[in-house]
Amino acid sequence: MDDKLFVYNALDGACTFEIRDAIWNDIKADGYGWTYGATIRLFEPLIFMMTRGIKINHEALAETKQDIQAASAAAQAELNKLAGRELNAQSPKQVQTYFYVEKGIDPYRGKEGQITADDKALARIARGTARRPGMREARLIQDIRGYEKLLGSYMEIAFDPDDRLRAAINPRGTKFGRFSTGKTVFGTGCNLQAMPQEFKKFLVPDDGYFFMEKDKRQAEWVVVAYISGDARMLHVIENGLDPHVYTGAMMLREQLPPDLQRQVTDKDLEDIVRLDSKVIGMLTDADEILQRRMADKTLRNVYQFLPRTMSIRQCGKKANHGLNYDEQYRMFALMNEIQESEAMKIIKLYHRIYSGIQHNFHAWVKQQLSKSGRTLTNCFGRRIRFLDEWGPDLYKSAYSALPQSTVVDGLNIGFCDIYEDDYITRTMNLDILAQTHDSLLFQVPITVLTSGKLYDVSRSIDKYLSPTMEYGGRKFTIATDTKVGWNWSGMHKDRNPLGLQELPECRSKLEFNQLVHHTLGIRQGSGVAAARNMASGSTRSTPAGAR
């Protein structure tokens, strides 16, 4: 290699330090010293992750590529049958002609007024309106495009010569502290942060290891609760309730006649939400949902107060995930494929239940922006300045800033603490392989489990990942869920039986060890040899869809 490149690289590094020294006083004076220090601390563990990479199961990758191609072909065949001819889902012209000319639908337009049949337009066409039923063809086109994107973006990724997936990680890739990831300098790898579940199934632990994922539970929702001080949100967290069930139950309560509201308890309503979730599951067809509810002697009495196209628990989940940052009804309807009138109703109910979000949290953020020169500072010391034009878009960005940055900063502090703990990463030989905003992926030697040491290691990791935070005089931590499995995707009994499975709360070391052995399919006392073949078991499945 040319010596000029080495000299250039050395000068580049030296100049960076000279620049740092020149502006260091300004960095500290402006309050960005914490952010600088936290970023520098991340470099060594990030370099480890980028160097280590994750093993690929190529056989399973090839099998699922075939399955996705078959699913795409089946969707195309159904689309052609409905259209009465071959319809190219990838052709904007053909798709626009089909819906806007042949079917007579009023054209949807993009931001600059141009006619479009992009994903948002297709979602609206598939959803339908009060005057027009939804169209199956639009959903099929979305699915076909999704399958093709999955094939092109993830099934054709260039891997490194050692059959591992690596990514370049930028610790300052986003405004609020989240990492951004992409291809390496060698042109291999991909964006790990946006990786679909279908692909994660082919990322597997090295021989003699299993995967353990630590995931912060309802993390941003918890932060919003403590910033806002909303009594109902705090009640959910501090009593260990299911927030999606509770939100659904309170939405149901708000719609009941006053005399009936006085007769039922919160537990009664939560039981109805759980029953509805069991009966409806993930169905979205309004007619089938109504039929199932009318067949149940309990649900038929309250069906008129339940959402038409999903279970009430699913409604609570979508509201919890989407409405803390002032999402408006049109976007909520589009993202969740429901009618705008339903979206308006859900949003009104949500903010009636959790009034502290708008009255306390949003009002406080606006006040802080005005008082502190458009700047917010999270509980760890990260300062975020907003330079956009005053208005709804700036406020929405600011509402999300503190919860997002608080979660990722708390996680990254724990990430560094774990990496620097010699017992965990060197004596026990755990590898940290990935960070995805609110979770960490580890590969753990099977010997750590079979020797009975996993419980203590897991608890140490949980402690590192649970720093005490404070907003408005309210101190709190965010609970951590533990998942174990033989690949990085979520467990499904049919589609991915070897995937990550969440462990319930355990009362003792013995119970924890028994549960992990059972979840991984390792017979206690069988040793490492009996477990080594688990990760290479069949992962063949029919994909649920690219969307």
Which residues fall in each region the model found?
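Conserved "right-hand" nucleotidyltransferase catalytic core of DNA-directed polymerases
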Residues: 1-198, 204, 208-210, 217-220, ...
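Hydrophobic (often cysteine-bearing) scaffold residues that line and stabilize catalytic clefts
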Residues: 12, 220, 240, 244, ...
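Conserved catalytic core of nucleic-acid polymerases
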Residues: 44-51, 162-167, 171-174, 255-257, ...
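Short secondary-structure boundary/capping segments
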Residues: 102-104, 185-189, 227-231, 450, ...
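Metal-dependent catalytic core segments for phosphate chemistry
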Residues: 213, 220-266, 381-389
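Short hydrophobic/aromatic beta-strand micro-patches
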Residues: 441-445
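Short, conserved charged micro-motifs
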Residues: 447-459
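A common structural junction motif
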Residues: 460-472
